[in-house]
């Protein structure tokens, strides 16, 4: 294990040198690629360097045990350092787990109202605000790509791109069915209604990922409807693209420019097709392992938001928090961190069982 990390440490030092090279800095695509590799390695190398320091300090304190005057202090230090060594050992094992190649990617977020009619659409809007505020806290960029608004507020469907560092890594476990329990404003008897929305987090496709034959596309243009000012319904700016082999359909009318709408629709189309391919691969892997991939089942009911009790429960890991207001305001780091830790431990367990 440590031979591998030492090789990675040499690579890390090479990257630090390359990133200060003016030639590399001038080549922005290469600079971004190397910066991403450097950022991916940094946590492991930092943990490894702390681990080596702890080993050196343990050795020094072992030698101090022979000194009667220093023995008691050395024993305390050995106890503390042994715990730190154990913690770092576990941290390094997790950091050495195979990386999800999508973790550093931007994402396409899709939220769709499900059962519950107007209340479900309102909750779709609540979820979109929650993710938007979480994105703000992480300094990510959110761009609306497409939406279908409900008459009473919220969205029947909303699609957005989220760009920034580690977006997919933090949000990938949000895919699934989100259930809400609350009293609608129109409910005179005060009865609690249950409704649901589905969330899909898809790693954004890059041009190298998927090659789409233009002959496989059916492109329709039409006049946009809804918000958009004086240009609405005056030009055929809205675009609908159908990928004939898969039947995938994407429409976009958010921009006044047909060219921009077409580019946004293509971005979503490529991402959906790539996501379908990856979902099929994940399903096969899960079947081979005879276990369900936690981030893969979009039909899985993953979470309940109970407004009368101010409670959020994530059913996959049994996490319950009684601070629903702050969660809906985008404070979901505790949830995303707990999910990542859970699935990392599952991966470690699977790795040790397969060793």
UniProtKB/Swiss-Prot annotation:
One GO CC annotation: cytoplasm
Gene Ontology molecular function: any one: translation release factor activity, codon specific
Location(s), subcellular: Cytoplasm
TM helices/strands, residue ranges: none
Keywords in alphabetical order: Cytoplasm, Methylation, Protein biosynthesis
Chain positions with N5-methylglutamine modification: 230
Top-rank taxon, per record: Bacteria
Gene3D superfamilies: 3.30.160.20, 3.30.70.1660, 6.10.140.1950
PTM: Methylated by PrmC. Methylation increases the termination efficiency of RF1.
UniProt entry tagged with the keyword Transmembrane helix: no
Pfam families: PCRF, RF-1
Family according to the record: Belongs to the prokaryotic/mitochondrial release factor family.
HAMAP family the UniProt entry points to: Rel_fac_1 (MF_00093)
Function: Peptide chain release factor 1 directs the termination of translation in response to the peptide chain termination codons UAG and UAA.
Official protein name in the record: Peptide chain release factor 1
Natural source organism: Trichlorobacter lovleyi (strain ATCC BAA-1151 / DSM 17278 / SZ)
């Amino acid at each position: 294990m440590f031979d591998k990390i030492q090789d990675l440490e040499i690579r890390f030092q090479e990257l630090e040198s390359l990133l200060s090279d003016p030639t590399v800095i001038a080549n922005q695509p290469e600079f971004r690629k190397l910066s991403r590799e450097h950022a991916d390695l940094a946590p492991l190398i930092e943990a490894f360097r702390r681990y080596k320091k702890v080993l050196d300090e343990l050795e020094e304190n072992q030698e101090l045990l022979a000194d009667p005057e220093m023995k008691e202090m050395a024993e305390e230090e050995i106890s503390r350092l042994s715990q730190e060594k154990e913690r770092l050992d576990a941290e390094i094992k997790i950091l050495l787990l195979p990386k999800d190649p999508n973790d550093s990617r931007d994402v396409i977020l899709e939220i769709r109202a499900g059962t519950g009619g107007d209340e479900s659409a309102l909750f779709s809007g609540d979820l979109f605000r929650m993710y938007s505020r979480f994105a703000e806290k992480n300094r990510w960029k959110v761009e609306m790509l497409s939406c279908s608004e409900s008459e009473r507020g919220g969205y029947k469907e909303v699609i957005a791109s989220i760009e920034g560092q580690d977006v997919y890594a933090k949000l990938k476990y949000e895919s699934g069915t989100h259930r809400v329990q609350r009293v609608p404003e129109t409910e005179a008897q005060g009865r609690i209604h249950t409704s649901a929305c589905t969330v899909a987090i898809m790693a954004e496709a890059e041009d190298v990922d998927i090659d789409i034959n233009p002959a496989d596309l059916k492109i329709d243009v039409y006049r946009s409807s809804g918000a958009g000012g004086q240009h609405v319904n005056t030009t055929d700016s809205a675009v609908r693209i159908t990928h004939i082999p898969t039947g995938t359909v994407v429409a976009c009318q958010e921009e006044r420019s047909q060219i921009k709408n077409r580019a946004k629709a293509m971005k979503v189309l490529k991402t959906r097709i790539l996501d379908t391919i990856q979902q099929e691969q994940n399903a096969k892997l899960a079947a081979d392992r005879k276990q369900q991939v936690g981030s893969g089942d979009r039909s899985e009911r993953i979470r309940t938001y109970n407004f009368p009790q101010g409670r959020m429960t994530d059913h996959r890991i049994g996490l319950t928090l009684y601070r629903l207001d702050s969660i809906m305001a985008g404070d979901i780091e505790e949830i995303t961190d707990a999910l990542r830790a859970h699935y990392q431990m599952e991966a470690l367990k699977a790795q040790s069982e397969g060793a």
